[in-house]
């Protein structure tokens, strides 16, 4: 398996309106629909759920995740 670097801004813009999974540096994960991304790469999610160890712990609704807390973002397959 090889690593292919990707420019993050177009990647995130392409995920708008799609379900995403966001993992924070501290281990928490949030799943929801990516509503918007700003120039600092802060993320706004709709219908967000918090996951701890892959288990849903609650519904949060609309949330904003500050860019400096994000470890990675990917399209959610579930």
Curated annotation (Swiss-Prot):
Gene Ontology cellular component annotations, sorted alphabetically: catalytic step 2 spliceosome; cytosol; nucleus; pICln-Sm protein complex; post-mRNA release spliceosomal complex; spliceosomal complex; U1 snRNP; U2 snRNP
Keywords: Cytoplasm, mRNA processing, mRNA splicing, Nucleus, Ribonucleoprotein, RNA-binding, Spliceosome
Major place of residence: nucleus
Cellular compartments annotated: Nucleus; Cytoplasm
Sm domain boundaries: 7-78
Keyword Nucleus: yes
Matches recorded under SUPFAM superfamilies: Sm-like ribonucleoproteins
GO molecular function, one term: RNA binding
Keyword match Cell cycle: no
Pfam families membership: LSM
Signal sequence annotation: none
GO biological process: mRNA 5'-splice site recognition; mRNA cis splicing, via spliceosome; mRNA splicing, via spliceosome
CDD domains to which the protein is assigned, alphabetical: Sm_F
Family: Belongs to the snRNP Sm proteins family. SmF/LSm6 subfamily.
Quaternary context: Belongs to the 40S cdc5-associated complex (or cwf complex), a spliceosome sub-complex reminiscent of a late-stage spliceosome composed of the U2, U5 and U6 snRNAs and at least brr2, cdc5, cwf2/prp3, cwf3/syf1, cwf4/syf3, cwf5/ecm2, spp42/cwf6, cwf7/spf27, cwf8, cwf9, cwf10, cwf11, cwf12, prp45/cwf13, cwf14, cwf15, cwf16, cwf17, cwf18, cwf19, cwf20, cwf21, cwf22, cwf23, cwf24, cwf25, cwf26, cyp7/cwf27, cwf28, cwf29/ist3, lea1, msl1, prp5/cwf1, prp10, prp12/sap130, prp17, prp22, sap61, sap62, sap114, sap145, slu7, smb1, smd1, smd3, smf1, smg1 and syf2.
Cross-referenced PANTHER family: SMALL NUCLEAR RIBONUCLEOPROTEIN F, SMALL NUCLEAR RIBONUCLEOPROTEIN F SNRNP-F
UniProt function note: Plays a role in pre-mRNA splicing as a core component of the spliceosomal U1, U2, U4 and U5 small nuclear ribonucleoproteins (snRNPs), the building blocks of the spliceosome.
Protein's UniProt name: Small nuclear ribonucleoprotein F
Provenance organism: Schizosaccharomyces pombe (strain 972 / ATCC 24843)
Source organism phylogeny: Eukaryota, Fungi, Dikarya, Ascomycota, Taphrinomycotina
